[in-house]
């Protein structure tokens, strides 16, 4: 930053001006003196001030060294500054063009001109650097900027070479369009290339090199890549690197440059496969150059087929086909196809033509591929938001000048003519048209030279094309003869025959001389026709069109072979592309950077006055200075000027409505601004401002005014936006209200309809509620079922003995029955789960009793509510009975015991007894003595009961068990209980029989029988009556 401040001080300090010179030649006192002009340039050059203005034209002197004037601090310092606020710099020119592009929407182009070695390529890089630094930092923008910046290393590697005058000379012309969006961020780009010097591929002058990429590949590729390409690092291995021993330049690091190229290719979206194919093509050219030929009986033969095989592999073609195409030529003459062998000279020509064509088309493909990567993704950008940068080869005068120098110098003539048209001529013509008082400035108009070269039917280009296309055997010599014949009298054409004696001594007979605007150049016609025809034998095109290498196949399409049209000559194509370039530049607002080479040695701090003066002359800088000094710095149409600055006067703001239109408005505006008449002139359609300071002051006032107007507009705008917002919100609320009201009304109507439908359906359902389900009562029935289920869930019985059950609608009766049964089972299950073992035993006995006695014996009902007990012996007798059981039963198990009354078989006298039930027998004990009276096995006896309400039991004893003693007649309290235990013990109910009679017979001793009558009375009892027994049961 310190060096920048010191430079700024040197540029602006008055006491430093004598030492550093003036920064704008317009300020030079003796502005008509060439000596003063050169002296000012030299002063600044010696102080490392390489930039100087002529008005808005920037003069750049190549320092041949790195200067610290392109840092980020410099970019910030020059950004958004007026042109003359800062010292001269390429950043100032770029910023001025950039702001005009964005703020005024005027297409711009930066024209960089000068001869070879004057620093044009470096200047174009600095323009790109400033644009990249000033644009946005979004991810997409960064991607575009990276691609724009990385395109330079690629184009320089393949299109630049070391010449005797320049280590990095552009051997092609380049015009780059950069497209911006409305915010000034680059969104894409496009590159046009012009006339690559492809002859350099096969031969170079002494001390010069081939294109950089060949040396970069050999120096920077890793061993694996070199092995794949079959290359060696030694430069003298390859014939096409003719200066191989001296090919390494200390100022150039080819290995680092190759890594930069690889990185740039990756950034610009070249795939790994594409990069491999590109380097393969470059390597194939080196191998092709080493292919030699011998001549056997007039036919060329390849010396080393291995080299052809290697080149064919890298190009992706058949080696045999490539070898045949290099040594033979096929001619199709009106359907007659003839293949003839080539001699050694023609084979070498075919080989070199192939190498040049492959490299030339590879370069064109690279540019196309770059353009695809740089293509803007947005299509809405204004067509005027484009800035062009022209970096084209400078004027060249070599010891030996050929077809390439002729084309390059023709291009420079056209650019010089454009410069004259847009500056010297057009500016003076404009003053005359506008009625501005003006003293004409004389200048050399090179249009006469351009016409000499390109005039139809008469110019050198037409003569060259005519000679190339005519039948017969045209040669370079016949071409020169025709030139001399037609142009000998032209003041800018010199031939050997009519040249002055002193020129004849240095001119050869195969040369002609043109007096260019930049000086006299002698051209050798050798190779003019050949290079113009640009002939590549059809056999080679056919071979390459079938290549496996995708890039080669793309560069040599099959449709080219099918075309019968003769291709345009090289010079015709070049002229057409140049004219197209001129059309592009004419529709843009130019910014000029005129580059000057201080010496031919490429050495820092050396200033050759004579060389610089020569460049100043032919660039027309003195004439440009005189026009600028006498002219006006700024001019604009009244409409544009008024539109931009009308806010500076109340008379013209917001719109001028007075008489006289925009011109009168501008006059009123400058009057209100208080301008002196010397500061401006009023033309017919434009306002001319003499001094930049006047415009800058006006612009500063406008920028200040913009803030005031912006505040007013902002306030009104905010008010308008708030009102619009309010109205929009109000409208939205009204719409929402209407929608809500409509929705609510729809919902209410829907509810009413639904309610009516429900009521209607309910009534119909109610009417048909007992019918089979139909369309009317289905919902009602379903609702009835639902309500019944809900009611049932609340009214379910909770006790087993509670047999009540809620009433069910008709359609639910079946389900009600099932649910009732299931609920009963459920309650029973719950009850059962709560039972103790004793309770469970009781229920088992009770169930057994119910099964046997219910409905069969009248006193069964009285037994239900009483728990069955296994022991019915009174307490006072229990011990004695238990003693009997313990002494008598043994393994038998006591099941039941009770007291009872036994009646004799004769006389029916009653006796107290105890009856015991074991698992095997019935025991009858004496009621007093506790002695066993009977033991009756259960499997031998059975029991008879009556169906009356009595406790009578007759035990039928088989005759073989009791010898004629007969049956036992017993009155047993709780007869149902005792009988149930018997049946439970035996396991079958058949042991007990119930008779439905009023009398019961029983067996007596010796087969005699007795009768027991059964009667019903108020009280139970037993009566003995005349030989029979009467049992009285209750009702």
UniProtKB/Swiss-Prot annotation:
One biological process term from GO is: determination of left/right symmetry
According to UniProt, the name of this protein is Unconventional myosin IC
Matching SUPFAM superfamilies, A to Z? P-loop containing nucleoside triphosphate hydrolases
Q: Which SMART domains match?
A: IQ, MYSc
The free-text domain note is: The myosin motor domain contains the derminants for the direction of left-right body asymmetry.
> GO molecular function, one example?
ATP binding
Under the heading InterPro entries, the entry gives: IQ_motif_EF-hand-BS, Kinesin_motor_dom_sf, Myosin_head_motor_dom-like, Myosin_TH1, MYSc_Myo1, P-loop_NTPase
Domain TH1, which positions? 857-1035
Q: Where in the cell is it found?
A: Cytoplasm; Cytoplasm, Cell cortex; Cell membrane
């Amino acid at each position: 930053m310190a060096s920048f401040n010191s430079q700024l001080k040197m540029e602006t300090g008055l006491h430093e001006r004598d030492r550093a010179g003036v920064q704008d030649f317009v300020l030079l006192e003796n502005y008509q003196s060439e000596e003063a002009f050169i002296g000012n340039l030299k002063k600044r050059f010696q102080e490392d001030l390489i930039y100087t203005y002529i008005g808005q034209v920037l003069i750049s002197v190549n320092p041949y060294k790195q200067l610290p004037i392109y840092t980020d601090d410099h970019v910030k310092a020059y950004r958004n500054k007026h042109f003359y606020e800062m010292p001269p710099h390429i950043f100032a020119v770029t910023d001025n063009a950039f702001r005009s592009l964005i703020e005024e929407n005027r297409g711009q182009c930066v024209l960089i001109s000068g001869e070879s070695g004057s620093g044009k390529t470096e200047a174009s890089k600095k323009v790109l650097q400033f644009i990249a630094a000033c644009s946005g930092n979004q991810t997409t923008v960064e991607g575009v900027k990276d691609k724009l910046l990385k395109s330079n290393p690629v184009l320089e590697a393949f299109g630049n070479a070391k010449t005797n005058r320049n280590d990095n000379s552009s051997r092609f012309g380049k015009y780059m369009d950069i497209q911006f969006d409305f915010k000034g961020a680059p969104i894409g780009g496009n590159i046009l290339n012009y006339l690559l010097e492809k002859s350099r591929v096969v031969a170079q002058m002494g001390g010069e090199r081939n294109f950089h990429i060949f040396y970069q590949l050999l120096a920077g590729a890793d061993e694996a890549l070199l092995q794949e390409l079959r290359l060696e690092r030694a430069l003298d291995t390859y014939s096409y690197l003719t200066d191989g021993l001296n090919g390494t330049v200390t100022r150039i690091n080819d290995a680092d440059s190759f890594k930069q190229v690889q990185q740039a290719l990756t950034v610009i979206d070249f795939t790994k496969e594409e990069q491999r194919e590109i380097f393969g093509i470059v390597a194939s050219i080196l191998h092709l150059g080493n292919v030699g030929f011998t001549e056997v009986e007039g036919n060329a033969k390849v010396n080393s087929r291995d080299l052809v095989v290697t080149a064919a592999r890298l190009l992706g073609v058949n080696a045999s086909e490539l070898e045949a195409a290099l040594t033979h030529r096929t001619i199709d003459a009106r359907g007659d196809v003839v293949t003839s062998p080539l001699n050694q000279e023609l084979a070498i020509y075919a080989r070199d033509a192939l190498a040049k064509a492959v490299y030339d088309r590879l370069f064109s493909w690279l540019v196309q591929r770059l353009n695809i990567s740089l293509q803007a993704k947005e299509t809405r950008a204004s067509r005027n938001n484009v800035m062009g940068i022209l970096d084209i080869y400078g004027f060249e005068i070599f010891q030996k000048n050929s077809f390439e120098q002729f084309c390059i110098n023709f291009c420079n003539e056209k650019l010089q003519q454009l410069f004259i048209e847009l500056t010297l001529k057009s500016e003076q013509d404009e003053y005359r048209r506008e009625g501005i008082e003006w003293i004409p400035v004389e200048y050399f108009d090179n249009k006469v030279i351009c016409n000499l070269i390109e005039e139809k039917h008469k110019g050198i280009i037409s003569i060259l094309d005519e000679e190339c296309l005519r039948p017969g055997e045209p040669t370079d010599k016949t071409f020169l003869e025709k030139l001399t014949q037609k142009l000998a009298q032209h003041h800018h054409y010199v031939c050997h025959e009519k040249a002055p004696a002193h020129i004849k001594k240095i001119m050869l007979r195969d040369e002609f001389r043109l007096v260019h605007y930049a000086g006299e150049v002698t051209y050798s016609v050798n190779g003019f026709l050949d290079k113009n025809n640009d002939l590549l034998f059809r056999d080679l095109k056919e071979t390459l069109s079938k290549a496996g290498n995708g890039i080669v196949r793309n560069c040599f399409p099959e449709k080219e072979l099918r075309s019968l049209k003769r291709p345009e000559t090289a010079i015709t194509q070049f002229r057409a592309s140049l004219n197209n370039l001129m059309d592009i530049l004419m529709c843009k607002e130019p910014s000029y950077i005129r580059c000057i080479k201080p010496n031919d040695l490429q050495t820092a701090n050396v200033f050759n006055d004579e060389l610089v003066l020569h460049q100043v002359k032919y660039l027309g800088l003195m004439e440009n200075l005189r026009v600028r000094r006498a002219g006006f710095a700024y001019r604009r149409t009244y409409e544009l000027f008024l539109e931009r600055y009308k806010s500076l006067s109340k008379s013209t703001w917001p719109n001028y409505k007075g008489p006289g239109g925009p011109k009168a408005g501008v006059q009123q505006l400058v009057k209100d601004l208080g301008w002196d008449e010397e500061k401006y002139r009023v033309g017919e359609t434009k306002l001319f401002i003499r001094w930049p300071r006047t415009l800058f002051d006006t612009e500063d006032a406008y920028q200040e005014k913009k803030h005031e107007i912006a505040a007013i507009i902002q306030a009104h705008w905010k008010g308008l936006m708030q009102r619009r917002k309010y109205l929009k919100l109000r409208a939205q609320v009204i719409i929402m209200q209407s929608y809500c009201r409509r929705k609510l009304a729809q919902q209410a109507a829907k509810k009413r309809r639904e309610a009516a439908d429900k009521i209607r359906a309910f009534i119909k359902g109610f009417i048909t509620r007992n019918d089979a389900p139909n369309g009317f009562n289905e919902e009602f029935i379903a609702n009835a079922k639902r309500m019944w289920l809900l009611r049932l869930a609340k009214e379910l019985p909770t006790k087993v003995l509670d047999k009540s059950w809620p009433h069910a609608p008709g359609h639910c009766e079946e389900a009600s029955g099932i649910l009732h049964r299931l609920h009963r089972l459920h309650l029973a299950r719950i009850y059962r789960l709560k039972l103790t073992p004793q309770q469970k035993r009781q229920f088992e006995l009770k169930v057994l009793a119910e099964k046997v006695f219910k409905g069969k014996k009248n006193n069964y009902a009285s037994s239900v509510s009483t728990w069955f007990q296994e022991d019915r012996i009174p307490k006072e007798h229990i011990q004695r009975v238990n003693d009997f059981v313990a002494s008598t039963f043994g393994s038998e198990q006591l099941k039941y015991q009770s007291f009872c009354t036994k009646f004799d078989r004769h006389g029916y006298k009653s006796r107290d007894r105890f009856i015991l039930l074991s698992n095997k027998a019935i025991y009858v004990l004496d009621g007093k003595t506790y002695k066993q009276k009977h033991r009756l096995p259960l499997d031998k006896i059975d029991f008879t009961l009556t169906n009356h309400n009595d406790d009578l039991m007759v035990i039928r004893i088989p005759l073989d068990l009791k010898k004629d003693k007969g049956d036992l007649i017993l009155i047993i309290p709780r007869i149902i209980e005792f009988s149930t235990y018997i049946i439970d013990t035996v396991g079958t109910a058949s042991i007990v029989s119930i008779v439905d009679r009023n009398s019961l017979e029983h067996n007596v001793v010796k087969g005699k029988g007795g009768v027991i009558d059964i009667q019903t009375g108020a009280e139970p009892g037993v009566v003995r009556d005349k030989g029979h027994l009467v049992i009285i049961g209750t009702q």
